[in-house]
Swiss-Prot record:
Consists of three domains: the N-terminal catalytic domain, the editing domain and the C-terminal anticodon-binding domain. The gene is proS. It comes from the Bacteria. It comes from Microcystis aeruginosa (strain NIES-843 / IAM M-2473). Homodimer. Keywords: Aminoacyl-tRNA synthetase, ATP-binding, Cytoplasm, Ligase, Nucleotide-binding, Protein biosynthesis. Its main location: cytoplasm. Belongs to the class-II aminoacyl-tRNA synthetase family. ProS type 1 subfamily. It catalyses: tRNA(Pro) + L-proline + ATP = L-prolyl-tRNA(Pro) + AMP + diphosphate. It is found in: Cytoplasm. This is Proline--tRNA ligase. GO terms for cellular component: cytosol. One of its GO terms (molecular function) is proline-tRNA ligase activity. Signal peptide: none annotated. The lineage of its organism: Bacteria, Bacillati, Cyanobacteriota, Cyanophyceae, Oscillatoriophycideae.
Protein backbone atom coordinates (compact mmCIF):
# COMPACT_ATOMS: atom_id res chain seq x y z
CA UNK A 1 0.00 0.00 0.00
CA UNK A 2 1.23 3.49 -0.85
CA UNK A 3 0.85 6.00 1.96
CA UNK A 4 0.10 8.71 -0.60
CA UNK A 5 -3.11 6.81 -1.44
CA UNK A 6 -4.11 5.85 2.10
CA UNK A 7 -6.31 7.72 4.57
CA UNK A 8 -3.41 8.49 6.87
CA UNK A 9 -3.31 11.41 9.29
CA UNK A 10 -1.00 11.60 12.31
CA UNK A 11 -1.07 14.06 15.20
CA UNK A 12 1.93 15.76 16.79
CA UNK A 13 0.19 16.34 20.15
CA UNK A 14 -1.49 13.90 22.51
CA UNK A 15 -5.31 13.98 22.27
CA UNK A 16 -6.96 15.63 25.28
CA UNK A 17 -9.23 12.67 26.07
CA UNK A 18 -6.44 10.07 26.14
CA UNK A 19 -5.19 9.04 29.59
CA UNK A 20 -2.84 6.10 29.02
CA UNK A 21 0.07 5.71 26.57
CA UNK A 22 -1.56 3.13 24.28
CA UNK A 23 -4.65 5.30 23.82
CA UNK A 24 -2.48 8.32 23.02
CA UNK A 25 -0.39 6.34 20.55
CA UNK A 26 -3.32 4.82 18.66
CA UNK A 27 -5.05 8.18 18.19
CA UNK A 28 -1.86 10.08 17.34
CA UNK A 29 -0.73 7.41 14.87
CA UNK A 30 -4.04 7.45 12.99
CA UNK A 31 -5.25 3.99 14.01
CA UNK A 32 -8.50 4.98 15.71
CA UNK A 33 -10.77 8.02 15.84
CA UNK A 34 -13.21 8.88 18.61
CA UNK A 35 -16.82 9.21 17.41
CA UNK A 36 -18.51 9.48 20.80
CA UNK A 37 -18.01 8.47 24.42
CA UNK A 38 -16.55 4.95 24.30
CA UNK A 39 -17.19 4.70 20.54
CA UNK A 40 -14.31 4.54 18.06
CA UNK A 41 -13.82 4.15 14.33
CA UNK A 42 -11.18 1.60 13.36
CA UNK A 43 -9.17 3.27 10.59
CA UNK A 44 -7.40 1.25 7.85
CA UNK A 45 -4.19 0.55 9.79
CA UNK A 46 -6.12 -0.55 12.88
CA UNK A 47 -8.42 -2.74 10.85
CA UNK A 48 -5.42 -4.62 9.49
CA UNK A 49 -4.20 -5.21 13.06
CA UNK A 50 -7.62 -6.46 14.14
CA UNK A 51 -7.83 -8.76 11.13
CA UNK A 52 -4.46 -10.26 12.02
CA UNK A 53 -5.43 -10.80 15.65
CA UNK A 54 -8.73 -12.33 14.53
CA UNK A 55 -6.96 -14.66 12.12
CA UNK A 56 -4.61 -15.94 14.82
CA UNK A 57 -7.61 -16.47 17.10
CA UNK A 58 -9.49 -18.22 14.31
CA UNK A 59 -6.60 -20.56 13.48
CA UNK A 60 -6.08 -21.64 17.09
CA UNK A 61 -9.79 -22.08 17.76
CA UNK A 62 -10.20 -24.17 14.62
CA UNK A 63 -7.15 -26.24 15.56
CA UNK A 64 -8.79 -26.93 18.94
CA UNK A 65 -11.88 -28.28 17.18
CA UNK A 66 -14.19 -25.29 17.62
CA UNK A 67 -16.60 -24.28 14.84
CA UNK A 68 -17.17 -20.67 13.79
CA UNK A 69 -20.68 -19.24 13.58
CA UNK A 70 -22.35 -15.84 13.92
CA UNK A 71 -25.07 -15.04 16.45
CA UNK A 72 -27.54 -12.12 16.47
CA UNK A 73 -26.60 -8.92 18.25
CA UNK A 74 -30.25 -8.16 19.04
CA UNK A 75 -31.46 -10.52 21.76
CA UNK A 76 -35.02 -11.00 23.06
CA UNK A 77 -35.50 -10.11 26.72
CA UNK A 78 -37.37 -13.40 27.22
CA UNK A 79 -34.16 -15.41 26.89
CA UNK A 80 -32.41 -13.32 29.53
CA UNK A 81 -35.44 -13.55 31.79
CA UNK A 82 -35.25 -17.34 31.50
CA UNK A 83 -31.66 -17.31 32.74
CA UNK A 84 -32.48 -14.76 35.44
CA UNK A 85 -29.96 -12.20 34.16
CA UNK A 86 -32.22 -9.56 32.58
CA UNK A 87 -32.56 -7.52 35.77
CA UNK A 88 -28.87 -7.99 36.60
CA UNK A 89 -27.76 -6.60 33.24
CA UNK A 90 -30.40 -3.90 32.77
CA UNK A 91 -30.90 -2.75 36.37
CA UNK A 92 -28.26 -3.96 38.83
CA UNK A 93 -25.15 -3.59 36.68
CA UNK A 94 -27.00 -1.63 34.02
CA UNK A 95 -24.50 -2.52 31.32
CA UNK A 96 -26.91 -3.79 28.66
CA UNK A 97 -28.32 -1.44 26.06
CA UNK A 98 -32.04 -2.28 26.22
CA UNK A 99 -34.75 -1.12 23.83
CA UNK A 100 -38.38 -1.68 22.94
CA UNK A 101 -39.42 -2.33 19.34
CA UNK A 102 -42.59 -1.10 17.60
CA UNK A 103 -44.49 -4.19 18.78
CA UNK A 104 -43.54 -3.22 22.36
CA UNK A 105 -41.19 -6.19 22.69
CA UNK A 106 -38.10 -5.74 24.86
CA UNK A 107 -34.69 -6.43 23.32
CA UNK A 108 -31.09 -6.05 24.35
CA UNK A 109 -27.88 -5.40 22.40
CA UNK A 110 -25.66 -8.33 23.25
CA UNK A 111 -22.86 -7.80 25.78
CA UNK A 112 -22.45 -11.59 25.75
CA UNK A 113 -24.28 -14.54 24.19
CA UNK A 114 -24.83 -17.33 26.75
CA UNK A 115 -28.61 -17.08 26.49
CA UNK A 116 -28.75 -17.05 22.69
CA UNK A 117 -26.36 -19.97 22.24
CA UNK A 118 -28.16 -21.99 24.94
CA UNK A 119 -31.44 -21.42 23.11
CA UNK A 120 -29.81 -22.70 19.90
CA UNK A 121 -28.46 -25.77 21.70
CA UNK A 122 -31.84 -26.40 23.31
CA UNK A 123 -33.44 -26.54 19.87
CA UNK A 124 -30.77 -28.53 18.04
CA UNK A 125 -28.95 -30.84 20.48
CA UNK A 126 -30.94 -33.94 21.28
CA UNK A 127 -28.51 -36.83 21.76
CA UNK A 128 -25.21 -37.60 23.47
CA UNK A 129 -23.93 -38.48 19.98
CA UNK A 130 -23.87 -34.75 19.17
CA UNK A 131 -21.60 -33.92 22.11
CA UNK A 132 -19.18 -32.38 22.81
CA UNK A 133 -19.45 -29.41 20.47
CA UNK A 134 -17.77 -25.99 20.70
CA UNK A 135 -19.10 -22.97 18.78
CA UNK A 136 -17.43 -19.57 18.52
CA UNK A 137 -17.93 -16.21 16.85
CA UNK A 138 -15.97 -12.99 16.35
CA UNK A 139 -18.25 -9.96 16.42
CA UNK A 140 -19.06 -6.59 17.96
CA UNK A 141 -20.39 -6.49 21.53
CA UNK A 142 -22.03 -3.63 23.42
CA UNK A 143 -21.76 -2.51 27.06
CA UNK A 144 -23.22 0.67 28.50
CA UNK A 145 -20.14 1.44 30.60
CA UNK A 146 -20.63 3.92 33.43
CA UNK A 147 -17.32 5.55 32.61
CA UNK A 148 -15.92 4.64 29.20
CA UNK A 149 -12.19 5.31 29.17
CA UNK A 150 -8.77 4.31 27.93
CA UNK A 151 -9.79 4.05 24.28
CA UNK A 152 -10.49 0.47 23.25
CA UNK A 153 -9.76 -0.84 26.75
CA UNK A 154 -13.15 0.08 28.14
CA UNK A 155 -15.42 1.14 25.33
CA UNK A 156 -19.15 0.85 24.83
CA UNK A 157 -18.65 -1.06 21.59
CA UNK A 158 -15.87 -3.59 21.10
CA UNK A 159 -14.84 -6.67 19.12
CA UNK A 160 -14.77 -9.98 20.93
CA UNK A 161 -14.31 -13.65 20.25
CA UNK A 162 -16.68 -15.68 22.39
CA UNK A 163 -16.94 -19.47 22.36
CA UNK A 164 -19.44 -21.77 24.04
CA UNK A 165 -18.92 -25.48 24.58
CA UNK A 166 -21.62 -28.06 25.16
CA UNK A 167 -20.38 -31.13 26.98
CA UNK A 168 -21.65 -34.48 28.21
CA UNK A 169 -20.67 -33.89 31.83
CA UNK A 170 -18.17 -32.11 34.06
CA UNK A 171 -15.34 -34.47 33.10
CA UNK A 172 -15.97 -33.77 29.43
CA UNK A 173 -16.12 -30.02 30.18
CA UNK A 174 -12.72 -30.12 31.90
CA UNK A 175 -11.17 -31.57 28.74
CA UNK A 176 -12.65 -28.79 26.59
CA UNK A 177 -11.62 -26.21 29.17
CA UNK A 178 -8.05 -27.54 29.07
CA UNK A 179 -8.06 -27.43 25.26
CA UNK A 180 -9.19 -23.80 25.39
CA UNK A 181 -6.50 -22.99 27.94
CA UNK A 182 -3.86 -24.34 25.54
CA UNK A 183 -5.42 -22.51 22.58
CA UNK A 184 -5.45 -19.22 24.50
CA UNK A 185 -1.82 -19.54 25.51
CA UNK A 186 -0.94 -20.22 21.87
CA UNK A 187 -2.92 -17.17 20.74
CA UNK A 188 -1.25 -14.77 23.14
CA UNK A 189 2.22 -16.15 22.42
CA UNK A 190 1.67 -15.84 18.68
CA UNK A 191 0.50 -12.25 19.19
CA UNK A 192 3.86 -11.53 20.84
CA UNK A 193 2.45 -10.73 24.28
CA UNK A 194 3.89 -11.23 27.76
CA UNK A 195 0.95 -12.57 29.76
CA UNK A 196 0.00 -14.41 32.93
CA UNK A 197 -2.89 -16.83 33.48
CA UNK A 198 -4.58 -16.18 36.83
CA UNK A 199 -7.45 -17.54 38.91
CA UNK A 200 -10.45 -15.27 38.54
CA UNK A 201 -13.90 -14.47 39.83
CA UNK A 202 -16.72 -15.61 37.54
CA UNK A 203 -18.83 -12.50 38.12
CA UNK A 204 -22.24 -12.21 36.46
CA UNK A 205 -21.34 -14.93 33.93
CA UNK A 206 -21.33 -17.49 36.74
CA UNK A 207 -19.90 -20.98 36.88
CA UNK A 208 -17.72 -23.09 39.14
CA UNK A 209 -14.26 -22.09 37.94
CA UNK A 210 -12.68 -19.47 35.74
CA UNK A 211 -9.30 -18.20 34.64
CA UNK A 212 -8.24 -14.84 33.25
CA UNK A 213 -5.36 -14.12 30.91
CA UNK A 214 -3.64 -10.87 31.80
CA UNK A 215 -1.28 -8.88 29.61
CA UNK A 216 1.21 -7.39 32.05
CA UNK A 217 1.32 -3.59 31.83
CA UNK A 218 1.71 -0.74 34.32
CA UNK A 219 -1.53 0.87 33.14
CA UNK A 220 -3.56 -2.31 33.68
CA UNK A 221 -6.88 -1.85 35.47
CA UNK A 222 -6.57 -5.17 37.29
CA UNK A 223 -4.26 -6.10 40.14
CA UNK A 224 -2.71 -9.56 39.99
CA UNK A 225 -1.27 -11.23 43.09
CA UNK A 226 1.31 -13.93 42.45
CA UNK A 227 4.20 -15.84 43.99
CA UNK A 228 7.79 -15.88 42.78
CA UNK A 229 7.74 -19.68 42.37
CA UNK A 230 5.05 -19.22 39.66
CA UNK A 231 2.77 -21.75 41.38
CA UNK A 232 0.07 -19.24 42.27
CA UNK A 233 -1.47 -16.24 40.51
CA UNK A 234 -4.92 -14.73 40.92
CA UNK A 235 -6.87 -11.59 40.29
CA UNK A 236 -7.05 -9.69 43.59
CA UNK A 237 -10.85 -10.17 43.47
CA UNK A 238 -10.34 -13.94 43.73
CA UNK A 239 -7.01 -14.21 45.55
CA UNK A 240 -6.65 -16.12 48.80
CA UNK A 241 -3.77 -16.14 51.26
CA UNK A 242 -2.80 -16.68 54.88
CA UNK A 243 -3.40 -13.58 57.04
CA UNK A 244 -0.66 -12.22 59.26
CA UNK A 245 -0.29 -13.96 62.62
CA UNK A 246 -2.51 -12.48 65.29
CA UNK A 247 -1.11 -10.73 68.35
CA UNK A 248 -2.76 -11.66 71.64
CA UNK A 249 -5.17 -9.19 73.19
CA UNK A 250 -3.82 -7.36 76.27
CA UNK A 251 -7.25 -7.58 77.92
CA UNK A 252 -8.06 -10.69 79.96
CA UNK A 253 -11.32 -9.55 81.54
CA UNK A 254 -14.55 -8.52 79.87
CA UNK A 255 -15.25 -4.81 80.25
CA UNK A 256 -16.90 -1.87 78.57
CA UNK A 257 -14.43 0.95 78.05
CA UNK A 258 -14.93 4.55 77.09
CA UNK A 259 -13.01 5.13 73.86
CA UNK A 260 -13.68 8.67 72.60
CA UNK A 261 -12.86 9.59 69.00
CA UNK A 262 -11.86 6.04 68.03
CA UNK A 263 -14.14 5.29 65.08
CA UNK A 264 -11.25 3.89 63.02
CA UNK A 265 -9.17 0.78 63.67
CA UNK A 266 -5.96 2.80 63.68
CA UNK A 267 -7.20 5.28 66.29
CA UNK A 268 -8.70 2.51 68.46
CA UNK A 269 -5.54 0.39 68.42
CA UNK A 270 -3.48 3.44 69.38
CA UNK A 271 -5.88 4.45 72.17
CA UNK A 272 -6.01 0.95 73.71
CA UNK A 273 -2.35 0.16 72.95
CA UNK A 274 -3.29 -3.10 71.23
CA UNK A 275 -2.70 -4.77 67.88
CA UNK A 276 -5.30 -4.42 65.13
CA UNK A 277 -5.35 -8.24 64.96
CA UNK A 278 -7.07 -8.31 68.38
CA UNK A 279 -9.96 -6.16 67.12
CA UNK A 280 -13.14 -7.35 65.42
CA UNK A 281 -14.55 -4.64 63.17
CA UNK A 282 -18.15 -4.92 62.06
CA UNK A 283 -18.91 -3.48 58.65
CA UNK A 284 -22.52 -2.71 57.78
CA UNK A 285 -23.75 -3.18 54.20
CA UNK A 286 -27.12 -2.54 52.58
CA UNK A 287 -28.10 -4.97 49.81
CA UNK A 288 -31.17 -4.79 47.58
CA UNK A 289 -32.34 -8.06 46.02
CA UNK A 290 -34.31 -8.41 42.79
CA UNK A 291 -37.32 -9.51 44.87
CA UNK A 292 -37.49 -5.94 46.19
CA UNK A 293 -36.23 -6.85 49.66
CA UNK A 294 -33.59 -4.69 51.35
CA UNK A 295 -31.31 -6.68 53.65
CA UNK A 296 -28.86 -5.22 56.15
CA UNK A 297 -25.68 -7.25 56.27
CA UNK A 298 -23.24 -7.17 59.19
CA UNK A 299 -19.77 -8.48 58.33
CA UNK A 300 -17.40 -9.23 61.23
CA UNK A 301 -13.74 -9.27 60.15
CA UNK A 302 -10.38 -8.90 61.88
CA UNK A 303 -9.28 -5.31 62.36
CA UNK A 304 -6.18 -5.55 60.18
CA UNK A 305 -8.14 -6.93 57.22
CA UNK A 306 -10.37 -5.41 54.53
CA UNK A 307 -13.59 -6.84 53.10
CA UNK A 308 -13.30 -8.08 49.52
CA UNK A 309 -16.61 -6.80 48.16
CA UNK A 310 -16.51 -9.14 45.16
CA UNK A 311 -16.35 -12.14 47.50
CA UNK A 312 -19.11 -10.57 49.60
CA UNK A 313 -21.31 -9.99 46.56
CA UNK A 314 -20.87 -13.60 45.47
CA UNK A 315 -21.88 -14.82 48.93
CA UNK A 316 -24.93 -12.57 48.96
CA UNK A 317 -26.03 -13.97 45.59
CA UNK A 318 -25.71 -17.46 47.10
CA UNK A 319 -28.01 -16.31 49.93
CA UNK A 320 -30.59 -14.84 47.51
CA UNK A 321 -33.05 -17.73 47.81
CA UNK A 322 -33.55 -16.84 51.50
CA UNK A 323 -35.23 -13.68 50.26
CA UNK A 324 -37.14 -15.21 47.31
CA UNK A 325 -34.60 -13.65 44.96
CA UNK A 326 -32.15 -14.70 42.26
CA UNK A 327 -29.61 -11.90 42.34
CA UNK A 328 -28.75 -8.57 43.90
CA UNK A 329 -29.46 -5.19 42.36
CA UNK A 330 -27.34 -2.99 44.62
CA UNK A 331 -24.73 -3.27 47.36
CA UNK A 332 -23.35 -0.35 49.37
CA UNK A 333 -22.18 0.82 52.77
CA UNK A 334 -25.09 2.98 53.99
CA UNK A 335 -24.39 6.50 55.20
CA UNK A 336 -26.46 8.29 57.85
CA UNK A 337 -28.95 9.52 55.25
CA UNK A 338 -29.52 6.03 53.83
CA UNK A 339 -30.21 4.67 57.31
CA UNK A 340 -33.34 6.78 57.64
CA UNK A 341 -35.16 4.38 55.30
CA UNK A 342 -34.77 1.32 57.51
CA UNK A 343 -33.28 2.23 60.94
CA UNK A 344 -35.48 3.08 63.93
CA UNK A 345 -32.72 5.36 65.21
CA UNK A 346 -29.24 6.49 64.05
CA UNK A 347 -26.66 3.72 64.33
CA UNK A 348 -23.34 4.25 66.13
CA UNK A 349 -21.16 3.97 63.03
CA UNK A 350 -17.57 3.16 63.98
CA UNK A 351 -18.70 1.58 67.25
CA UNK A 352 -20.94 -1.23 66.00
CA UNK A 353 -20.63 -4.65 67.64
CA UNK A 354 -21.46 -8.10 66.23
CA UNK A 355 -24.57 -8.26 68.46
CA UNK A 356 -26.28 -5.19 66.98
CA UNK A 357 -29.96 -5.71 67.83
CA UNK A 358 -32.47 -6.61 65.14
CA UNK A 359 -35.08 -4.29 66.67
CA UNK A 360 -33.12 -1.39 65.21
CA UNK A 361 -34.68 -2.33 61.86
CA UNK A 362 -38.03 -0.83 60.92
CA UNK A 363 -40.91 -3.21 60.36
CA UNK A 364 -41.74 -3.04 56.64
CA UNK A 365 -42.62 -5.56 53.93
CA UNK A 366 -39.61 -4.59 51.84
CA UNK A 367 -37.06 -4.72 54.70
CA UNK A 368 -35.72 -8.02 56.06
CA UNK A 369 -36.60 -8.20 59.78
CA UNK A 370 -33.13 -9.38 60.85
CA UNK A 371 -29.53 -8.53 60.07
CA UNK A 372 -27.77 -11.08 57.90
CA UNK A 373 -24.68 -11.73 60.03
CA UNK A 374 -21.52 -13.05 58.38
CA UNK A 375 -18.17 -13.77 60.03
CA UNK A 376 -14.91 -13.84 58.13
CA UNK A 377 -12.61 -16.76 58.88
CA UNK A 378 -10.13 -14.41 60.57
CA UNK A 379 -12.36 -13.74 63.60
CA UNK A 380 -13.45 -17.24 64.57
CA UNK A 381 -10.45 -18.08 66.76
CA UNK A 382 -9.95 -14.69 68.41
CA UNK A 383 -9.97 -14.66 72.22
CA UNK A 384 -10.44 -11.72 74.59
CA UNK A 385 -11.20 -9.65 71.52
CA UNK A 386 -12.01 -5.96 71.24
CA UNK A 387 -15.10 -4.77 69.36
CA UNK A 388 -17.78 -2.09 69.28
CA UNK A 389 -20.23 -1.70 72.17
CA UNK A 390 -23.07 -0.42 69.94
CA UNK A 391 -22.72 2.96 71.63
CA UNK A 392 -20.83 5.93 70.28
CA UNK A 393 -17.55 6.40 72.16
CA UNK A 394 -17.48 2.93 73.73
CA UNK A 395 -15.91 -0.47 72.98
CA UNK A 396 -15.95 -3.89 74.60
CA UNK A 397 -12.64 -5.49 75.57
CA UNK A 398 -11.79 -9.02 76.71
CA UNK A 399 -14.87 -10.38 74.90
CA UNK A 400 -15.27 -13.94 73.63
CA UNK A 401 -17.47 -15.71 71.11
CA UNK A 402 -20.07 -18.01 72.65
CA UNK A 403 -19.89 -16.22 75.98
CA UNK A 404 -20.44 -12.54 75.32
CA UNK A 405 -22.08 -12.83 71.89
CA UNK A 406 -22.96 -15.53 69.39
CA UNK A 407 -20.60 -16.37 66.54
CA UNK A 408 -22.55 -16.01 63.26
CA UNK A 409 -23.55 -19.31 61.65
CA UNK A 410 -22.43 -18.05 58.25
CA UNK A 411 -18.61 -18.16 58.24
CA UNK A 412 -17.01 -17.32 54.89
CA UNK A 413 -13.68 -16.15 53.45
CA UNK A 414 -14.40 -12.48 52.76
CA UNK A 415 -10.98 -10.94 53.35
CA UNK A 416 -9.01 -9.17 50.67
CA UNK A 417 -5.63 -10.79 50.05
CA UNK A 418 -2.77 -8.31 50.22
CA UNK A 419 0.79 -7.92 49.02
CA UNK A 420 3.13 -9.52 51.55
CA UNK A 421 0.62 -12.15 52.69
CA UNK A 422 1.92 -15.69 52.94
CA UNK A 423 0.82 -18.07 50.20
CA UNK A 424 -1.44 -20.98 51.10
CA UNK A 425 0.44 -23.50 48.96
CA UNK A 426 3.77 -22.54 50.57
CA UNK A 427 3.90 -20.16 53.57
CA UNK A 428 7.51 -19.37 52.68
CA UNK A 429 6.25 -17.68 49.52
CA UNK A 430 4.75 -14.20 49.84
CA UNK A 431 2.30 -12.54 47.48
CA UNK A 432 3.67 -9.97 45.05
CA UNK A 433 1.67 -7.57 42.90
CA UNK A 434 1.57 -6.64 39.24
CA UNK A 435 -0.85 -4.70 37.05
CA UNK A 436 -2.58 -6.47 34.22
CA UNK A 437 -5.01 -5.95 31.35
CA UNK A 438 -7.56 -8.74 31.04
CA UNK A 439 -7.59 -9.93 27.42
CA UNK A 440 -9.10 -13.38 27.86
CA UNK A 441 -11.37 -15.23 30.27
CA UNK A 442 -12.45 -18.87 30.30
CA UNK A 443 -15.26 -20.28 32.44
CA UNK A 444 -16.56 -23.67 33.51
CA UNK A 445 -20.24 -22.74 33.53
CA UNK A 446 -21.52 -26.17 34.45
CA UNK A 447 -25.31 -26.43 34.42
CA UNK A 448 -26.28 -22.83 35.26
CA UNK A 449 -27.77 -21.94 31.87
CA UNK A 450 -28.85 -25.37 30.66
CA UNK A 451 -30.95 -25.99 33.76
CA UNK A 452 -32.40 -22.47 33.83
CA UNK A 453 -33.29 -22.63 30.13
CA UNK A 454 -34.19 -26.32 29.91
CA UNK A 455 -31.38 -27.34 27.53
CA UNK A 456 -31.28 -31.12 27.97
CA UNK A 457 -30.03 -34.08 25.93
CA UNK A 458 -30.67 -37.81 26.08
CA UNK A 459 -27.71 -39.77 27.45
CA UNK A 460 -26.65 -43.33 26.59
CA UNK A 461 -29.03 -44.71 29.20
CA UNK A 462 -31.95 -42.87 27.61
CA UNK A 463 -32.18 -40.35 30.44
CA UNK A 464 -32.81 -36.64 30.01
CA UNK A 465 -29.68 -34.81 31.21
CA UNK A 466 -28.75 -31.10 31.35
CA UNK A 467 -25.94 -30.08 29.01
CA UNK A 468 -22.72 -29.14 30.80
CA UNK A 469 -21.42 -25.83 29.43
CA UNK A 470 -18.28 -23.74 29.24
CA UNK A 471 -17.64 -20.30 27.76
CA UNK A 472 -14.42 -18.70 26.55
CA UNK A 473 -13.87 -15.04 25.62
CA UNK A 474 -11.07 -12.97 24.09
CA UNK A 475 -11.29 -9.20 23.69
CA UNK A 476 -9.92 -8.80 20.17
CA UNK A 477 -9.90 -5.00 20.08
CA UNK A 478 -8.70 -4.79 23.68
CA UNK A 479 -5.88 -7.25 22.93
CA UNK A 480 -4.67 -5.02 20.10
CA UNK A 481 -4.45 -1.98 22.35
CA UNK A 482 -2.94 -4.06 25.18
CA UNK A 483 -0.11 -4.99 22.82
CA UNK A 484 0.62 -1.28 22.42
CA UNK A 485 0.41 -0.67 26.17
CA UNK A 486 3.00 -3.36 26.65
CA UNK A 487 5.32 -2.20 23.88
CA UNK A 488 5.88 1.47 23.08
CA UNK A 489 8.50 4.17 23.59
CA UNK A 490 8.69 7.96 23.46
CA UNK A 491 8.53 7.85 19.66
CA UNK A 492 5.42 5.71 19.33
CA UNK A 493 4.18 2.15 18.94
CA UNK A 494 6.38 -0.95 18.74
CA UNK A 495 4.12 -3.61 17.22
CA UNK A 496 4.88 -7.31 17.60
CA UNK A 497 5.67 -8.53 14.07
CA UNK A 498 2.77 -11.00 14.01
CA UNK A 499 0.05 -8.37 14.44
CA UNK A 500 1.67 -5.27 12.94
CA UNK A 501 -0.45 -3.76 10.15
CA UNK A 502 2.56 -4.09 7.85
CA UNK A 503 5.86 -5.84 8.45
CA UNK A 504 8.03 -3.30 6.66
CA UNK A 505 7.91 0.25 5.38
CA UNK A 506 10.05 1.61 2.55
CA UNK A 507 10.78 5.32 2.98
CA UNK A 508 11.83 7.60 0.13
CA UNK A 509 13.68 10.53 1.76
CA UNK A 510 13.72 12.69 -1.39
CA UNK A 511 11.10 12.28 -4.11
CA UNK A 512 13.18 14.48 -6.41
CA UNK A 513 15.92 11.85 -6.45
CA UNK A 514 15.05 9.46 -9.29
CA UNK A 515 17.40 6.75 -8.01
CA UNK A 516 15.80 6.77 -4.56
CA UNK A 517 12.32 6.51 -6.09
CA UNK A 518 13.29 3.75 -8.52
CA UNK A 519 15.00 1.63 -5.85
CA UNK A 520 12.14 2.13 -3.40
CA UNK A 521 9.53 1.13 -5.99
CA UNK A 522 11.54 -1.97 -6.88
CA UNK A 523 11.99 -3.04 -3.24
CA UNK A 524 8.34 -2.34 -2.48
CA UNK A 525 7.24 -4.68 -5.28
CA UNK A 526 9.82 -7.38 -4.48
CA UNK A 527 8.99 -7.45 -0.78
CA UNK A 528 5.24 -7.72 -1.35
CA UNK A 529 5.75 -10.44 -3.97
CA UNK A 530 7.88 -12.33 -1.43
CA UNK A 531 4.99 -12.27 1.05
CA UNK A 532 6.40 -9.48 3.23
CA UNK A 533 3.59 -6.99 3.76
CA UNK A 534 5.13 -3.64 2.95
CA UNK A 535 4.11 0.02 2.97
CA UNK A 536 5.67 2.59 0.66
CA UNK A 537 5.99 6.11 2.04
CA UNK A 538 5.88 8.04 -1.22
CA UNK A 539 4.31 11.17 0.28
CA UNK A 540 5.62 14.59 -0.65
CA UNK A 541 6.90 15.28 2.87
CA UNK A 542 10.25 16.07 4.45
CA UNK A 543 12.40 13.06 5.34
CA UNK A 544 12.23 13.92 9.06
CA UNK A 545 8.42 13.81 9.00
CA UNK A 546 8.47 10.42 7.29
CA UNK A 547 10.95 8.98 9.80
CA UNK A 548 8.90 10.27 12.74
CA UNK A 549 5.69 8.84 11.29
CA UNK A 550 7.35 5.47 10.65
CA UNK A 551 8.38 5.31 14.32
CA UNK A 552 4.97 6.53 15.48
CA UNK A 553 2.95 3.90 13.61
CA UNK A 554 5.34 1.19 14.78
CA UNK A 555 6.09 -0.81 11.62
CA UNK A 556 8.73 -3.41 12.67
CA UNK A 557 11.27 -2.75 9.87
CA UNK A 558 12.07 0.52 8.10
CA UNK A 559 14.00 0.53 4.81
CA UNK A 560 15.43 3.88 3.71
CA UNK A 561 16.63 4.46 0.15
CA UNK A 562 19.00 7.24 1.10
CA UNK A 563 22.72 8.00 1.02
CA UNK A 564 23.69 4.30 1.19
CA UNK A 565 22.49 3.85 -2.40
CA UNK A 566 25.88 5.13 -3.59
CA UNK A 567 27.42 1.88 -2.33
CA UNK A 568 24.53 -0.31 -3.52
CA UNK A 569 22.93 -0.52 -0.08
CA UNK A 570 19.92 0.70 1.86
CA UNK A 571 19.55 1.52 5.54
CA UNK A 572 17.43 -1.01 7.45
CA UNK A 573 16.22 -0.04 10.94
CA UNK A 574 14.58 -2.39 13.44
CA UNK A 575 11.81 -0.49 15.23
CA UNK A 576 12.08 -2.41 18.51
CA UNK A 577 15.84 -2.11 19.02
CA UNK A 578 16.43 0.94 16.78
CA UNK A 579 19.40 -0.98 15.45
CA UNK A 580 20.38 0.37 12.02
CA UNK A 581 22.25 -1.70 9.42
CA UNK A 582 23.36 -1.17 5.85
CA UNK A 583 22.11 -4.04 3.71
CA UNK A 584 22.85 -4.72 0.06
CA UNK A 585 19.81 -3.99 -2.09
CA UNK A 586 19.69 -7.53 -3.48
CA UNK A 587 19.81 -9.01 0.06
CA UNK A 588 16.97 -7.02 1.63
CA UNK A 589 14.28 -9.63 0.92
CA UNK A 590 16.29 -12.55 2.32
CA UNK A 591 17.43 -10.44 5.30
CA UNK A 592 13.85 -9.59 6.26
CA UNK A 593 12.55 -13.11 5.64
CA UNK A 594 15.17 -14.45 8.03
CA UNK A 595 14.51 -11.76 10.64
CA UNK A 596 10.73 -12.26 10.55
CA UNK A 597 10.97 -16.05 10.68
CA UNK A 598 13.23 -15.81 13.75
CA UNK A 599 10.75 -13.56 15.53
CA UNK A 600 7.82 -15.81 14.65
CA UNK A 601 9.75 -18.89 15.82
CA UNK A 602 10.51 -17.26 19.18
CA UNK A 603 6.82 -16.44 19.67
Amino acid sequence: MRLSQQLFVTLREDPAEAEIPSHKCLVRAGYIRRIGSGIYAYLPLMWRVLQKVSQIVREEMNKAGAQECLLPQLQPAELWQESGRWDTYTKAEGIMFALTDRQNRELGLGPTHEEVITAVARDLIRSYRQLPVNLYQIQTKFRDEIRPRFGLMRGREFIMKDAYSFNLDEECLKKTYQAMDIAYRNIFRRCGLAFRAVEADSGAIGGSASQEFMVLADAGEDEVLFTADEKYAANVEKAVSLPADKVASPFKKFAKKETPNTNTIESLAKFLDCAATAIVKNVLYEVVYDSGITVLVLVSIRGDQEVNEVKLQNELVRQASRYNAKTILALKIPDAAAQQKWATKPLPLGYIGPDLEDNLLKKASDIAPQFLRIADNTVTDLENLITGANETGFHLVGANWGKDFILPELIVDLRKAQVGDRAIHDPNQTLQSARGIEVGHIFQLGYKYSQAMNAFYTNEAGESTPICMGCYGIGVSRLAQAAVEQSYDKDGIIWPVAIAPYQAIVVIPNLADAEQVKTAESLYNELNQAGIETLLDDRDERAGVKFKDADLIGIPYRIVTGKSLKSGKVELVERASKKASEVAINEVVSYLKTAISKVNASD
